[in-house]
Amino acid sequence: MAEAAPEIPPENENPQREPWEEWIGEILEEIKQEALKHFDPRLLTALGNFIYSRHGDTLAGAGELIKILQRALFLHFRAGCQHSRIGQSGGGNPLSTIPPP
């Protein structure tokens, strides 16, 4: 019985993905800009300082800040932000403009 040839992983010919740290930084900046439209900048500064005191300048800290800001924005929109149709009665469904099949 002949031995099977060793498995060789395929060569990765795709373009290299952008670095994780750069992607996290871009996402954090986008969420921060959106949060500044809806929350007091002093609150966001205090939150950033709190996260920094717990995690320092790490990816874990950036991830934690992203998670908290996403939740805060979601709850803010659900509560009826005046800039959003989410959570408001009569706001309408944005998908209703798509004709049915």
Swiss-Prot record:
Keyword Transcription regulation found: yes
**One matching Pfam family, short form?**
VPR
Which keywords fit this entry according to its UniProt record? Activator, AIDS, Cell cycle, Host G2/M cell cycle arrest by virus, Host nucleus, Host-virus interaction, Modulation of host cell cycle by virus, Phosphoprotein, Transcription, Transcription regulation, Viral penetration into host nucleus, Virion, Virus entry into host cell
Q: GO:BP terms for this protein? A: symbiont entry into host cell; symbiont-mediated arrest of host cell cycle during G2/M transition; viral penetration into host nucleus
Mark the residues carrying the PTM Phosphoserine: S84
Q: Which InterPro entries match?
A: RetroV_VpR/X
The answer to whether UniProt assigns keyword RNA-binding to this entry is no
Gene3D superfamilies named in the record: 6.10.210.10, VpR/VpX protein, C-terminal domain (1.20.5.90)
Subunit structure of this chain's protein: Interacts with human UNG.
Its biological purpose is as follows: Stimulates gene expression driven by the HIV-2 LTR. Prevents infected cells from undergoing mitosis and proliferating, by inducing arrest or delay in the G2 phase of the cell cycle. Cell cycle arrest creates a favorable environment for maximizing viral expression and production.
Name of the protein: Protein Vpr
